Regions:
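Catalytic histidine-centered segment of alpha/beta-hydrolase-like enzymes
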Residues: 458-468
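Alpha/beta-hydrolase fold catalytic core
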Residues: 280-430
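Short alpha-helix in the alpha/beta-hydrolase fold that links the catalytic acid
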Residues: 418, 432-442
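Catalytic histidine neighborhood in serine/cysteine hydrolases
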Residues: 444-460
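N-terminal cap/lid subdomain of alpha/beta-hydrolase-fold enzymes
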Residues: 3-6, 48-148
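Alpha/beta-hydrolase active-site loop
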Residues: 121-125, 132, 149-169
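Alpha/beta-hydrolase fold nucleophile elbow
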Residues: 172-184
Length: 488
């Protein structure tokens, strides 16, 4: 089934593709000329047979003489098994979606509007967008070689091999180098940075990155995402639940961030202590904690009572608007759909049945294939795979070496100049900002080189004209070596 469903080329007839184009775009009032190189980056076995390909989309500014001081950003999404579609057409490329002020727009049906990305980072950095093996236009040509790519460390090592070859091919080893990952792409970035400076299973890479830009952080001190984190997960989820409750119910007149930080302070002190005390908590204190938890999160006291004050990620999705008969999006808690019922199937999935995925997936896919690829002169008779859910079964989530949080901490220890910027959406239930706070504190990341910032958005936090401007301006600040939080 893997061959038939997810492989649109075989090694017998595979020919590496390469497409070139040129363009110019106005960014911050100035014209920026550039060239693009979109191509297969092929992996071969010991007898020269192609077994896989990473597909890359390189945007290179052409009027720059000193490339040694010009940063290169390598950007990708997550999954694992997800193509670069979201970050590519969302905010990194020279063309992007036109956003509206209403997060519940656009319609899921065409026509869709694509515009020049006047927020693009190409004025300050060259950009390489990456489709990993078996995602997007990336290919797994030999299914028997899946274990060389579809696992945490092999995936990261494949990325490093590609980056090493790209830097050599385009003479950019002396340039500042940044990894930009979204969602699982954050784990990929952390593991790649750790292996780059410390070595992989069979080889060294001897590479250092100037910084990591982590959008929708998935790195934790646990095994995989939030597995085996030695703390109460509802405490980490508290800021996200509070933000979504603020958006839908407006329990106070406080600004969003003021309310969320107040909720976080309650969660990390009174709420956490109450959970720790359990049945030893006096009834009067229990009732007070239950009331305040319901006030901040929007989850009913009755539900909290039934679950001993705790709530999970799925409870944020299903309980905050339960009285309205609506489900929230796991990827953007502002977006809703009518409540899932048994008539729709027996198994509710917070991924497949997600309101934001249903809304934005068709928009991004059509814009990328219908507008962006033709502009890049890409003409390829190959199926573009936005996300390969098969990886959920085939992708090995266990590490043979260090956990993702340990890899990041080790990389920052070995590379004293490496800096990390966590950018998170307040309304993102999938990768909650509380996880980033906890990671920074419990992986003991250097405080002077670690920056965390929340945005009034969801998992794809660049959605919205104000959000994409804020994010890209903050990335520009980060690339200058400054603190993104220093901006108002």
């Amino acid at each position: 089934m893997f061959d038939a469903m997810y492989k649109t080329a075989s090694f017998e007839n595979f020919k590496p593709a390469r497409f070139l184009s040129q363009g110019s775009i106005e960014i911050n009032g100035a014209q920026v000329p550039y060239e693009t190189i979109c191509e297969d980056n092929v992996f071969y076995n010991n007898v020269g047979k192609p077994i896989a390909s990473i597909f890359s989309y390189s945007y290179i500014r052409t009027d720059v003489k000193d490339r040694n001081n010009r940063p290169v950003i390598f950007g990708f999404n997550g999954g694992p098994g997800t193509s670069s579609m979201m970050v590519h057409v969302g905010f990194l490329g020279t063309k992007r979606l036109k956003y509206t002020d209403d997060c519940n727009q656009p319609s899921t049906l065409p026509p869709y509007e694509v515009i020049d990305n006047f927020n693009c980072l190409l004025d300050v950095a060259d950009i390489v967008v990456v489709d990993p093996v078996a995602t997007g236009y990336g290919l797994l040509l030999d299914a028997e070689c899946a274990d060389q790519f579809l696992a945490i460390e092999p995936d990261a090592e494949a990325l490093l091999t590609f980056i090493s070859c790209w830097l050599t091919k385009y003479s950019r080893w002396m340039s500042p180098k940044y990894l930009l990952g979204e969602s699982y792409g954050c784990i990929r970035s952390a593991v790649a940075a750790g292996i780059a400076s410390g070595g992989g299973k069979k080889r060294a890479y001897s590479m250092a990155f100037d910084g990591l830009i982590l959008i929708g952080n998935s790195i934790t001190t646990g095994r995989y995402f939030n597995q085996d984190i030695p703390t109460e997960l509802s405490v980490l989820a508290f800021p996200t639940a509070a933000a979504i409750n603020w958006y839908h119910h407006h329990p106070t007149q406080q600004p969003l961030e003021t309310f969320v930080q107040e909720a976080r302070a309650f969660a990390e002190r009174d709420y956490l202590l109450a959970l720790f005390r359990g049945n030893d908590l006096p009834q009067e204190e229990y009732v007070d904690i239950r009331r305040r938890t319901a006030f901040y999160t929007g989850i009913s006291e009755a539900y909290l009572d039934e679950h001993l004050l705790r709530f999970q990620e799925e409870d944020i999705v299903t309980q905050i608007l339960r009285e309205k008969g609506e489900h929230l999006s796991r990827y953007d808690g502002r977006i809703t759909l009518p409540r899932f019922t048994s008539q729709m199937g027996s198994n509710f999935s917070t991924v497949k049945d997600d309101p934001a995925t249903a809304k934005y997936g068709p928009y991004f896919h059509a814009a990328l294939c219908g507008e962006v690829f033709p502009a890049l002169n890409i003409h390829l008779e190959r199926d573009f795979v936005p996300s390969a859910s098969l990886h959920g079964d085939r992708f090995v989530r266990e590490t043979y070496d260090r956990l993702s949080g340990q890899q990041l901490s080790s990389a920052m220890r070995r590379c004293p100049g490496m800096r990390v910027f966590f950018a998170s959406g307040w309304y993102d239930v999938c990768t909650q900002i509380g996880m980033a706070y906890y990671l920074a504190n419990h992986a003991y990341l250097p405080k002077d080189r670690t920056f965390i910032k929340g945005y009034p958005s969801g998992h794809m936090l660049y959605i919205g004209e104000e959000n994409i401007k804020a994010l890209n301006d903050d990335i520009r600040t980060f690339l200058k070596g400054e603190n993104p939080n220093s901006k108002p």
